[in-house]
Amino acid sequence: MLASRSPRRRQILELAGWPFDVQESHADETIPPGTPPDEAVQLLARRKVEAVMSSFPDAYVLGADTIVVCDGRLLGKPRTEEEAFAMLRQLSGRTHDVWTGVAIALPQGSITSFAEKTAVTFWELDDEEIAAYIATGEPMDKAGAYGIQGRAALFVKRIEGDYLTVVGLPLSRTVRELRRLGWPPA
């Protein structure tokens, strides 16, 4: 069971070739001040899993959350176009970290989690480029105000780490963790 509203996470998990269902998770996405990024994404992923697992007690439930960190500042999803502009301006010409946390609930109710980090460097962006990207609407539902798998791919100068961590689900690590935990059942 995938506890997510993200079509990107659904598409990534389909690459594993296992059947799964999707249940939207409406968990609290606030992060306590001062929470380190690796802990923050695991906390949010766990909340998503916890919001869904009681309805599916016999299922493996997977949840994930992604944040962007630049200069020690956590960048979630922008609430306004102005906020998206400010985020993209901050990322312009710089390297930032993208963290994705994954939580997995087992049928017996225990939850395990992990976090993965990928460094992304953007080219220098001008205001017109940023405004044109925001006008597409693409950045509004994405951490850090960009989707690397969309038009923002044009902004990327370099990436160090797992590309799918930036998209929203580090698939190779997730599959290894699921196998370690007994999925798929024999």
UniProtKB/Swiss-Prot annotation:
One GO process term, biological-process aspect: nucleotide metabolic process
SUPFAM superfamilies for the chain: ITPase-like
Keyword Cytoplasm among record annotations: yes
Catalytic activity from the UniProt record: dTTP + H2O = dTMP + diphosphate + H(+); UTP + H2O = UMP + diphosphate + H(+)
Database matches in Pfam families: Maf (PF02545)
Catalytic residues of the enzyme: 65
Keywords, sorted A to Z: Cytoplasm, Hydrolase, Nucleotide metabolism
Hydrolase in keyword set: yes
Cellular-component GO terms for this entry: cytoplasm
Any GO molecular function: dTTP diphosphatase activity
Co-factor requirement: a divalent metal cation
Enzyme Commission (EC) number: 3.6.1.9
Site feature: Important for substrate specificity: 8, 66, 149
Compartment(s): Cytoplasm
Reported function: Nucleoside triphosphate pyrophosphatase that hydrolyzes dTTP and UTP. May have a dual role in cell division arrest and in preventing the incorporation of modified nucleotides into cellular nucleic acids.
Family: Belongs to the Maf family. YhdE subfamily.
HAMAP family, per database record: Maf (MF_00528)
Protein's UniProt name: dTTP/UTP pyrophosphatase
Lineage of the organism: Bacteria, Bacillati, Bacillota, Bacilli, Bacillales
Gene that this polypeptide is encoded by: maf
